[in-house]
Structure formats: C-alpha cells, structure tokens
C-alpha cells in the first residue's frame, strides 16, 4: 500500500464519528453480526443501533485499533495478534465479519469525504482493510 497517501488521509479522519457509524452500519446492514453485541441493549431498529452509546463507544475503540494498524502497515499480523486471539479464541467471531466491517468502513469514508475519497484512495484503503481483516483472522489459520 501507498503508506504516505494512507497516513496523510487518515490524519483527517474523525475516529469517533467514523468508528461509531461504521460499527453501527455493520450491525444494521448485516444483522446477524448483532449476536456478538446482545449485551449492548436495544439494537431493534437502525435508529436504535446508530443512537446506541455502547455501539458508538465500541466503534471508536475499533477505529482506534485500526488507527494503530495504519501506523504499522508493515506488521499488521503482529499489531493485531492479541485482538485476533481475543476475537477468534474467546469470542469466536466469524472472520468474514472482519471483511464485512472493512468494506463498511470504506463506504463510511466515502460518505464522509465525498470527492476527496478518490478511486485511488479507495484502492489503497481496500488493501489496508483486507490486510487488517486477514491479520485479525490469523488465529483461524
């Protein structure tokens, strides 16, 4: 991936907003992913999900972690080793969900940045989200 392009763009991302929306959209668009978040309270409608404080907080946490990955693009596997262990061994999250969240993140970035999120930038971010998803799924292999 083009590190300079990615890190330069990422510095403009409002992690709390984008993270909250990305996780919220994942739970709405792919409702079966909600089973990992049943303890978050009301997830019965799109408005409930997107307004849920626990969803917002976890979305920020997810994107803070992704930000850390953006700073360590050469070692995604090492960067996400502990999170991979947690999500795979303890939470038993289907690794496909990591790919889905990555794709939702790209949609949210496009929504927030419009024309600034060029096809070239999208291509770079698809590589990054694929790399992060692969690193998170590492414990399954």
From Swiss-Prot:
InterPro entries, per the entry: Globin, Globin-like_sf, Globin/Proto, Hemoglobin_b, Hemoglobin_oxygen_transport
Presence of the UniProt keyword Iron in the record: yes
Secretion signal span: none
One GO molecular-function entry: peroxidase activity
Biological processes, Gene Ontology terms: hydrogen peroxide catabolic process
Domain Globin residues, every copy: 1-141
Keywords: Heme, Iron, Metal-binding, Oxygen transport, Transport
Superkingdom, natural source: Eukaryota
One GO cellular component term noted in the UniProt record for this chain: blood microparticle
Function: Involved in oxygen transport from the lung to the various peripheral tissues.
Oligomeric and partner information: Heterotetramer of two alpha chains and two beta chains.
Name of the featured protein: Hemoglobin subunit beta-C
Organism: Ovis aries musimon (Mouflon)
Gene label: HBBC
């Amino acid at each position: 991936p083009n590190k300079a392009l990615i890190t330069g763009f990422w510095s403009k991302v409002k992690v709390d907003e984008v993270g909250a929306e990305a996780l919220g959209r994942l739970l709405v668009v792919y409702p079966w992913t909600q089973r990992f978040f049943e303890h978050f309270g009301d997830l019965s409608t799109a408005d409930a999900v997107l307004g849920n404080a626990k969803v917002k907080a976890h979305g920020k946490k997810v994107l803070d972690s992704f930000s850390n990955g953006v700073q360590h693009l050469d070692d995604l596997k090492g960067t996400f080793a502990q999170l991979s262990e947690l999500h795979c061994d303890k939470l038993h999250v289907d690794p496909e969900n990591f790919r889905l969240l990555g794709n939702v993140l790209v949609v949210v970035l496009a929504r927030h940045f419009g024309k600034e999120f060029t096809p070239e930038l999208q291509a770079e971010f698809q590589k990054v989200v694929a790399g992060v998803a692969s690193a998170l799924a590492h414990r399954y292999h």
